[in-house]
Design a protein with these regions (language model features):
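Extended two-metal-dependent nuclease catalytic cores across DNA- and RNA-processing enzymes
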Residues: 1-168
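Cytoplasmic/organellar membrane-interface segments at the starts of transmembrane helices
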Residues: 172-174
Length: 174
């Protein structure tokens, strides 16, 4: 595997490697970002993974790197780009799903439909608690009803766990 020589090189260069059995890299990043915030520090996460955008806050920004462009996301930039708050990105993903992360979502509702629902109603929980009262098309209501379990599971799967049991002493990473 190419990972072992890379890990060795990063260690020799003075970088600290953090792993945690049963947790994904996103969870570790989220946990460390939360620790930075709790210590009054600002945090910038450099990644190519859009899932990290849910971690954006007043103290944490995400530098999303790709072949096409690099964008620094702040809460304002996410609102401008997606029309929702960073935490609401989790809700959108729960409805639209994400095949790359094995998140099923609601069958038949894509990014635009999911974005519209969350811009209006903000959370999956609210949508299902008020499904009969929402001003939505019957077809959308039927899709939501048929995929309720998937949507709730997708909401849980899509949220980064910011409580991974890793060393959160920020001083140990400087």
């Amino acid at each position: 595997s190419q990972m072992e020589p890379l890990k060795k090189l990063l260690t020799l260069l003075g970088y600290r490697l953090v792993t945690c059995e049963g947790f994904e890299a996103d969870d570790i990043l989220g946990t460390l970002a939360k620790a930075c915030e709790e210590n009054g520090n600002e945090c910038v996460i450099a990644t190519g993974d859009r899932d990290s955008l849910q971690l954006v806050s007043d103290k944490t920004s995400v530098h999303l790197c790709s072949n096409k462009q690099d964008i620094l996301y702040t809460p304002e930039k996410i609102l401008e780009a997606y029309g929702v708050t960073p935490k609401e990105l989790i809700e959108i993903k729960a409805i639209q799903g994400d095949t790359s992360d094995n998140i099923p979502g609601v069958a038949g509702i894509g990014p635009k439909g999911a974005g519209d629902l969350i811009q209006r109603y903000h959370t999956v929980e609210y949508i299902y608690d008020h499904l009969d009262e929402l001003e939505i098309k019957d077809g959308v209501r039927k899709k939501l009803t048929a995929s309720k379990e998937n949507a709730i599971l997708s909401r849980m799967l899509g949220e980064i766990n910011c409580n991974a049991p890793v060393d959160t002493n920020v001083e140990n990473y400087v």
